[in-house]
Amino acid sequence: MKRTILLLSLLLAAAAYAQPSEPAVNYYAKDGTVQASDGTVYSVDGADSPTITICNAENRYTAADASSSLYYKDGRRLETVEEYGRVDGAVADQEAFTRIFRDMFTDEQIVALRNLRLPLAVGCAVNPEDGVQFEVSFVIGNYPELTSLSPDFYRTFEKRLKEEVRWHVNDFAKQLKYMFGLTIFNFRKLPLTSELEEKPAE
């Protein structure tokens, strides 16, 4: 009798293990808008393409259909390739940027994202005066690992990037009303918790 119960338990466990897992929710399955729990609305563009743009619906400069033109503070538009080539800037504290990613993603997510091609890029509009990212948008690979992350996730992500990341721009860029920044993030360079542990002294 005990053997029968044991065999039955093993069969039930095997059957449960064999059940296909539920497909991940895709919050960005179609173009349009989605809403975070705090009421923030995000525009979704490219849901049927390899990459999807997710940006705050209030964004003016980094929306999917926004102009890529830049302007001097006096209102003149940059006209030449040479002018655009002189605009330069970079994240001032790369460690702050990396820390946000470490906080936002679990080790399991990082491992999965390391295996994907171009999973995530962060675009932004930067105030050249203080280096603040006043607009942030996300371009994600159309992968379940990223489309299953809720609008609340991207809302928190956006807020932290705006609050904690600053850009250092060159003198030419400081003549502009705003400039654009783009960071294509390489998850293979993002350490896991185990990789952050101190190595034993030799």
Where does each model-flagged region fall?
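Charge-biased low-complexity segments
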Residues: Q19-E202
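Hydrophobic h-region of N-terminal signal peptides that target proteins for export
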Residues: S9-A18
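A periodicity- and composition-biased signal for non-globular, repetitive helical segments
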Residues: L8-S9, N170
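Positively charged n-region of N-terminal signal peptides that target proteins for export
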Residues: M1-T4
